[in-house]
UniProtKB/Swiss-Prot annotation:
GO terms for molecular function: hydrolase activity. 3',3'-cUAMP binds at residues 12, 141, 147. It comes from Enterobacteria phage T4 (Bacteriophage T4). Transmembrane segments: none annotated. Keywords: Hydrolase. The gene is 57B. Changing residue 141 to A: Partial loss of cleavage of 3'3'-cGAMP. It comes from the Viruses. This is Anti-CBASS protein Acb1.
Length: 152
C-alpha cells in the first residue's frame, strides 16, 4: 500500500524496445544523417511523466506496439528535437491507464513518440516511416525534473 509521502515523488514510466527495433531506429538515424542522435541505450518512449506518484503497474511481454510513424521537428526550450511520432493505440492506452490512476500530464495531449535527436539545429525532417516498433519492456522510476542533465 502506498503511503502519503509516496505520492509526492512523481512518477516516470517509459517503454523500451526490442533489439530489432533499436537496429531499425539506428539505421534511420544514420540514413537521415541525424545530428546529435540519441544513443541506442537511451532510446525510449515516455508513457507517463507525472508530478504525483500513482500505483502504475508496468506491462510485461514483447509485442508490436506500432508499425509506422512520421517524422516531426518540435521546438523546445533547448532547441529543435527530432521525433518519430508513432501511430500507437497501445501507448495511448497505457498513458490513459496512468491518467485514470491519477497521474498528471503537463501538455494538452499525449503524443506517442520516440526522440531521435534532442538537437538537430536548423535542419528540418519530415516523411512517413515504416518500422516495426516492438516493446521489450516498460519500466517506472521516481520522476526526475532535471532529466535533461543526463543527456549531457
Amino acid at each position: 500500500m502506498m503511503e502519503f509521502k509516496d505520492f509526492s515523488t512523481g512518477l516516470y514510466v517509459a517503454a523500451k524496445f526490442s533489439e530489432l527495433t533499436l537496429d531499425a531506429l539506428e539505421e534511420l538515424q544514420r540514413s537521415l544523417r541525424v545530428p546529435n542522435p540519441v544513443p541506442r541505450e537511451k532510446i525510449h518512449s515516455t508513457i507517463c511523466y507525472s508530478r504525483v506518484n500513482v500505483p502504475y503497474v508496468p506491462s510485461s511481454g514483447s509485442f508490436e506496439v506500432a508499425s509506422s510513424g512520421h517524422l516531426e521537428v518540435w521546438k523546445t526550450q533547448d532547441g529543435s528535437t527530432l521525433v518519430l511520432v508513432l501511430d500507437s493505440e497501445y501507448l495511448r492506452c497505457r498513458h490513459m491507464y496512468a491518467r485514470a490512476l491519477g497521474a498528471t500530464h503537463d501538455f494538452d495531449d499525449y503524443t506517442p513518440h520516440i526522440t531521435l535527436s534532442y538537437n538537430v539545429g536548423p535542419l528540418s525532417f519530415s516523411g512517413d516511416v515504416q518500422i516495426p516498433v516492438v516493446l521489450d519492456r516498460e519500466y517506472k522510476e521516481p520522476l526526475k525534473l532535471d532529466w535533461a542533465d543526463d543527456l549531457k
